[in-house]
Amino acid sequence: MIPSRISHKFPLFLRSSLAAPKAAYRFSSTIPKPSDQVPDVDAFLNKIGRNCNELKDTFENNWNNLFQWDSKILKEKGVNIQQRKYILKQVHNYRNNRPIHEIKLGKKSFFGGERKRKAFTAKWKAENKQ
């Protein structure tokens, strides 16, 4: 037997679980219109750089594909993880009216990362003294 205090909440639980999935409505109203600077998918991919313009055939030059596809779909299309994350970040920025521009890849230091830099520098100097 179901206690009386839970029984009045049970139909609400059923009603919410049987509702249409939220994923279907996820990006329906958040697809921005193309601007003068970014009129189509090809221009968007050229503007963000990092050789993303090679993927214009993947998006089929369709503005809706660019803003509706998630990481799972891009993975199925064969886009590598670094470009997927980068494109989705730039799409998110454009959707939120933030400026989009190319973010250059970082360059590794000759002496390694920040944590071990002192050790590598000391080792390199010791080798060069001899």
UniProtKB/Swiss-Prot annotation:
Signal peptide: none annotated. This is Small ribosomal subunit protein mS41. Its main location: mitochondrion. Belongs to the mitochondrion-specific ribosomal protein mS41 family. One of its GO terms (biological process) is mitochondrial translation. It comes from the Eukaryota. One of its GO terms (molecular function) is structural constituent of ribosome. It is found in: Mitochondrion. Component of the mitochondrial small ribosomal subunit (mt-SSU). Mature yeast 74S mitochondrial ribosomes consist of a small (37S) and a large (54S) subunit. The 37S small subunit contains a 15S ribosomal RNA (15S mt-rRNA) and 34 different proteins. The 54S large subunit contains a 21S rRNA (21S mt-rRNA) and 46 different proteins. Component of the mitochondrial ribosome (mitoribosome), a dedicated translation machinery responsible for the synthesis of mitochondrial genome-encoded proteins, including at least some of the essential transmembrane subunits of the mitochondrial respiratory chain. The mitoribosomes are attached to the mitochondrial inner membrane and translation products are cotranslationally integrated into the membrane. mS41 is involved in telomere length regulation and required for survival upon exposure to K1 killer toxin. It comes from Saccharomyces cerevisiae (strain ATCC 204508 / S288c) (Baker's yeast).
